[in-house]
Amino acid sequence: IMGHMVNSLAQIDEFVGLGSNSIETDVSFDKQANPEYTYHGIPCDCGRSCGHSTKFNDFLKGLRKATTPGDSKYHEKLILVVFDLKTGSLYDNQAYDAGTKLAKNLLQHYWNNGNNGGRAYIILSIPKLNHYKLITGFKETLKNEGHGDLLEKVGHGFSGNDDISEVQKTYNKAGVTGHVWQSDGITNCLLRGLSRVKAAVANRDSGSGIINKVYYWTVDKRSTTRDSLDAKVDGIMTNYPDITVEILNEDAYKKKFRIATYEDNPWETFKE
């Protein structure tokens, strides 16, 4: 259950309190490709305030506390964070630098330079396929800093609703062979069918595709929640985690689905 648009530290507590075991956070960049704020801006989902904003490194420090066992702010249930990287403001040739700078920020402020940092799994979600060098920059930086082991905690997604075969080709270019979460969706203000979600699920289940997990966004209605579960998604991104919890407790779903814990491997495709 992925809490949507969690861009302030107070919202971490709020969304986990409502039932989220995962959050999605928007990351804006400055002109030099430095991650700057956790901020979505206008327009955003209907019924939500678009203006929550935190300095990126301050958010990382708070997130670290929320995902470090023993800390007073620790939430055992919070195990996955999707960074929705707003790289649309950057030139294509800045993608590598953005990845480098993102890695350095996470290493210092979230992973505490490898010394008992936050334990959550991280997904780097990129809107444009031609920004795939962000992945390269991120990976090479962690390796160069002597912390390549942390890549075990990092997964990937492209959020642009591109053709699945194009996504697959882009991962090949980026040297990505696993840890792939494929999203599909649209703002809650509009309706979208499930055909692309079903194509992503088929790729996931084919055994020959690159996708490990599929999630759908932004799912706020009970009917859409049921439709998503019927399509066999792995994750639901929502503004109302308590509604997702309610549906998961219905007889039709409570035997088939459960909320993931830290012991579950987010990079392993679930086999029925």
Curated annotation (Swiss-Prot):
Catalytic residues of the enzyme: H4, H40 (nucleophile)
InterPro entries: PLC-like_Pdiesterase_TIM-brl
Covalent S-S links between cysteines: C44-C50, C46-C189
Keywords from the UniProt entry: Cytolysis, Dermonecrotic toxin, Disulfide bond, Hemolysis, Lipid degradation, Lipid metabolism, Lyase, Magnesium, Metal-binding, Secreted, Toxin
Function comment: Dermonecrotic toxins cleave the phosphodiester linkage between the phosphate and headgroup of certain phospholipids (sphingolipid and lysolipid substrates), forming an alcohol (often choline) and a cyclic phosphate. This toxin acts on sphingomyelin (SM). It may also act on ceramide phosphoethanolamine (CPE), lysophosphatidylcholine (LPC) and lysophosphatidylethanolamine (LPE), but not on lysophosphatidylserine (LPS), and lysophosphatidylglycerol (LPG). It acts by transphosphatidylation, releasing exclusively cyclic phosphate products as second products.
Cofactor annotation remark: Binds 1 Mg(2+) ion per subunit.
Organism placement in taxonomy: Eukaryota, Metazoa, Ecdysozoa, Arthropoda, Chelicerata
Cofactor: Mg(2+)
Pfam families in the record: GDPD_2 (PF13653)
Tissues expressing the protein: Expressed by the venom gland.
Enzyme Commission identifier(s): 4.6.1.-
GO cellular component: extracellular region
Protein name: Dermonecrotic toxin LvSicTox-alphaIC1aiii
GO-annotated molecular function: lyase activity; metal ion binding; phosphoric diester hydrolase activity; toxin activity
Family, as annotated: Belongs to the arthropod phospholipase D family. Class II subfamily.
Broad class of the protein's primary localization: secreted
Catalytic activity: an N-(acyl)-sphingosylphosphocholine = an N-(acyl)-sphingosyl-1,3-cyclic phosphate + choline; an N-(acyl)-sphingosylphosphoethanolamine = an N-(acyl)-sphingosyl-1,3-cyclic phosphate + ethanolamine; a 1-acyl-sn-glycero-3-phosphocholine = a 1-acyl-sn-glycero-2,3-cyclic phosphate + choline; a 1-acyl-sn-glycero-3-phosphoethanolamine = a 1-acyl-sn-glycero-2,3-cyclic phosphate + ethanolamine
Residues noted as binding Mg(2+) in the record, renumbered to the chain: E24, D26, D84
GO biological process, one term: killing of cells of another organism
Source organism: Loxosceles variegata (Recluse spider)
Subcellular location: Secreted
CDD domains, per the entry: GDPD_like_SMaseD_PLD
